Design a protein with these regions (language model features):
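Alpha-helical transmembrane segments of helical membrane proteins, especially in multi-pass transport
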Residues: 110-132
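Membrane-interface interhelical connector segments
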Residues: 30-47, 94-103, 107
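Alpha-helical transmembrane segments of multipass membrane proteins
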Residues: 17-21, 60, 64, 153-157, ...
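Small-polar-interrupted transmembrane alpha-helices in polytopic inner-membrane proteins
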Residues: 64, 75-102
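Interfacial helix-start motif at the membrane-water boundary
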Residues: 44-67
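Terminal transmembrane helical module of multi-pass membrane proteins
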Residues: 125-165
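Interfacial helix-loop-helix junctions of multi-pass membrane proteins
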Residues: 98-116, 158-165
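N-terminal signal-anchor transmembrane alpha helix
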Residues: 2-33
């Protein structure tokens, strides 16, 4: 199934971008500056609800899922959606990667599980978009799989982020 293959490729690309961002921070020796910019304290994470975390993440993924549906009706929308979706994924994973480079193992312990689930959720939504972009018939089953996977992964990620893994 090409949707599963695409989701795997998007996940791999996201992981690669995050690693590159982390390496850039470490190689340039700007960990302190990046930590000052983020202002995070891994020893005392912020207190937000799982609903808040889920709502923030689902908005981003919804753009890809709705984009997949929209492309069936208006194929030229890809000229607008392609750069938006690419930028959303790239910016999010680069920010996470830079933070991991700056904070190292303490932050990695806090975010590893839920960040990977969030990336996989974005990849599932992105896979639906890529499927529609190639003008392959986006079956209702494939779209439903992507939507259910996205929502399920984001729910699990939100619970892990708030209550710890």
């Amino acid at each position: 199934m090409s949707v599963v293959r695409d989701a795997g490729r998007i996940t791999a690309a996201g992981l690669l971008l995050a690693v590159v961002a982390a390496l850039v921070v470490v190689v340039l020796g700007v960990e302190h500056d990046v930590r000052a910019w983020y202002g995070l304290h891994p020893s005392s994470p912020s207190r937000v609800s799982a609903t808040h975390v889920f709502a923030n993440n689902i908005r981003t993924c919804a753009i890809a899922l709705l984009g997949a549906v929209n492309l069936r009706l208006w194929p030229r929308a890809r000229w607008l959606l392609d750069p938006i979706l690419a930028a959303l994924l790239a910016i999010n994973v680069l920010l996470v990667g830079a933070a991991l480079g700056a904070y190292g193992t303490p932050l990695l312990r806090l975010v590893a599980a839920h960040a990977l689930l969030e990336l996989m959720a974005a990849a599932a939504a992105g896979a639906a978009y890529l499927h529609a972009r190639r003008r392959e018939p986006l079956s209702l089953a494939a779209l439903a799989w992507c939507a259910v996977a996205t929502v399920g992964l984001l729910l699990l990620a939100a619970v892990l982020e708030v209550h710890g893994a």
